[in-house]
Amino acid sequence: TLMRSSAASDVYKRQLYDGTQPNPTFDNIEDARSLYVENNCEAIIAFGGGSSMDCAKVAAARVVRPNTPIPKMRGVLKVLRKLPPFFAVPTTAGTGSETTIAAVVTNPKTHEKYAINDPVLRPKYAVLDPELTVGLPPHITSTTGMDALTHAVEAYIGHSNTRDTEENAKRAVKMIFDNIETVYRDGKNIEARGEMLLASYYAGVAFTRAYVGYVHAIAHNLGGMYGIAHGLANAIILPYVLEYYGESAHKRLAELAEAASITQPGMTDAQKAEAFIAAIRRLNQDMNIPDKIEQIQEKDIPTLVERALKEGNPLYPVPKIMNEADCEMVIRRLMP
């Protein structure tokens, strides 16, 4: 939603852009930017899920960087110019985009996702209203919630943490395990909806500082190649990547298992980590999230591997570095 103030009064006029699609494209962004510029808008309200917020972020970046095409913004610190006043109103509990410095957009010609990271992309204001999420269908509730869980887990197990990111990530994990199945089965439970919104926010705060990992690197590129919803891709991929990390992530995953109250006395760190991964698989199964991605095609695997590693290495501070063979193995495990 784009706003324009009237100089003659205190009334605000608005221009609405509602063409954003899941995995927003360059065209979506340029259309939104054109609407903003042509109507002399002065502020932006991003209302919706992660796709809407990411589209709005990059449209705002294009407003202040009119001579910089979107591909040139890819990576870190490529905007570096203050955005117009920016308000984020999430209607899903998952992406945490209302508090992150990141936006992800799709090049429709190459089917490649571009991650754009810059502190100026963090919205100035965020409104967390659980009433806006009560109408979400169960499958959106579940996959966006697992998206938030992925943010918290990848932030916590990485090597770029602070005390604050650790606390926010653990808090988010506990809140999600305590509430996600409740909101999946009873979408009108306003208290649980509020907890999920806060969990998504805390996870967003955590990964904005501590980054994510290979789950996101692979999910972004599956989304770009096949249009798979980001939360769904993360939910399916998460346990496979955690298994790949093995011993390098056991201690951290054990701590998250304790935060989620799924451990038993006498368990080793390895057993706690395995219990945590099993609990993620169980959540997926209980919420009818598949454990394979049918769209993956054999001919696309080399491109998926190349693009995932290009995104992940060396930016993401992961517990264990993937090489091409490792990444291919994980992607093949995702195939039916």
Give the location of each predicted region.
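Single conserved hydrophobic/aromatic residue that forms the stacking wall/gate
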Residues: 1-8, 12
